[in-house]
């Protein structure tokens, strides 16, 4: 019971006292500087599984991590591996997570989930915190939709078939800005998908043994957040969608 409560507190600290007394333990799992085991895990796994040819020197970073003033800091000699870590994460989000095809299929899957919500009680599971039922909602749902003859699933089947045949939303244009754009369209055939990508996280990593290098550059500046607005439509020759994109050029 103690270990379970401890793990829960590390993931989501319930008291300020816990954070102050064991801040470095919390940082191992979720660090405001963006360097933690959770991010290392998915960056290494996702780059390998998607064939993205970028590596992370995770062992060098971990071997040069120290606890000082009750928080995690890093030896200055692993500045480059840490910068490479941030760069790889940035590329992963740009090229994989927010790729036009990925966000398009995600949008269609959301539509499928809306269509089957009543049959599978998805919203009800979350509202009533019925997590046993919730975790039973696996990818098998797709097979169920595909093979079970149920008129209530007709629209979900159509969307699933569109995904299979790549009859999905196409990218009309992408706008990158330093703040979120207030862009909407009353046309239901035009979909606006907004995301944001951080290079750094909430704060910069802190280094030790940094006395041999003097820099006149301002390194204490977080890279700005990129706000990405994708204008998507099933048909890229949609005049209204193209006009909406062109209006931002």
Language-model features: where?
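Histidine-centered, transition-metal-coordinating active-site segments
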Residues: 2-249
